[in-house]
């Protein structure tokens, strides 16, 4: 999982990327290709 300042570039890396909020943190998840996971912070 990458940790980045801004998720704007992370959510456009793959068509299946979704931006999700969990426990106050913002994540990008991808069920088709899990190597595109990222977290903001």
Curated annotation (Swiss-Prot):
GO molecular function, one term: structural constituent of ribosome
Record Pfam families: Ribosomal_L36
Presence of keyword Transferase: no
Domain of life (superkingdom): Bacteria
Protein name in the entry: Large ribosomal subunit protein bL36
Coiled-coil stretches: none
UniProt keyword list: Ribonucleoprotein, Ribosomal protein
Family: Belongs to the bacterial ribosomal protein bL36 family.
Gene Ontology process terms (BP): translation
GO CC terms of this entry: ribonucleoprotein complex; ribosome
Organism: Rhodospirillum centenum (strain ATCC 51521 / SW)
InterPro entries named in the record: Ribosomal_bL36, Ribosomal_bL36_sp, Ribosomal_L36_bact
Gene: rpmJ
């Amino acid at each position: 999982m990458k940790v980045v300042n801004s998720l704007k570039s992370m959510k456009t890396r793959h068509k299946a990327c979704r931006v999700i909020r969990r426990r106050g943190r913002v994540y990008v998840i991808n069920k088709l290709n899990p190597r595109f996971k990222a977290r903001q912070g």
